[in-house]
Amino acid sequence: LAAFVTVKTGRPALVILDRKENFAATTTRHAMEMRVSLGADRDGTLRAIKIENMSNTGAYGEEGPPVTMVVANNILPSYNRARAIYYNGRTIYTNMVAGGALRGYGASWQTSWA
């Protein structure tokens, strides 16, 4: 709508959504619960990492599985010296606002616990 008005008038246009429209028409980040277990040698060298990730993609969110996979792709290379690596990512669909693709696609969760 804003693009149409801008083209027709030659002036910038702004769309302002009320709270109800905002939740109905936009997406959120995927809520995630991560459980991380680390194993190390006596000298402190990281040798094992286990990550269990549950991603809430909301209702009808098609970005859920890709975001869960991108989280693994962003986290696991950081620990390339670990001899044992385990990642289990699950995406669940709930009666919440749908999660969608935002900036830093799948990257913000890796820094939340590291």
Give the ranges of each region predicted by the language model.
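Structural alpha/beta core scaffold segments of enzyme domains
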Residues: 1-114
